[in-house]
Amino acid sequence: MNIAELRAFMADIRTRQAKLDAQMLEANARMISLMHDPVAPTFVIPERELVAHGGLTSREAREVVSRGLVTEVAPEMGAVLAAGDTTAAHVDALGRGLKIAGAEREAFLTHLPELVEASTTMTASQFDQLVKETAKSVVADDGLSTFERQKRETFVIAGLIRLV
């Protein structure tokens, strides 16, 4: 196998892994929907089920549940993952961006179409950097939050004070 064939082989594996990750997210979503079934609600703890019957470690199960929350907010990202066009690492990066955005989540989500498109062409680390920059750009407030925090503080952290 030459390098071109190895690269094609790895790309095929990546696509299959993305589709498997999407199926795990689908199973997680189904477990959650079973809990909220109005006819026959079933008590299910998705993490436990994923560990006991999905063959995952506790950490991997938590990651699946976390990714499920991300794809619930951004179903477009789940769709490209199911198509095999992006990876679970890209979904994780988007989740970190949502955490950074915090209260400015809606402003961050206005950039979602561009981010989803970028996730199909960028590496996970490049995409992570783009997501962080995008999230920080929507929460930037020209120092107003820093000023508000400083007004509430009851002590001085650094600097000289001159009392007259």
Please annotate each region the language model reported.
Residues 1-164:
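Conserved C-terminal region and hinge/linker of Rieske [2Fe-2S] proteins, especially
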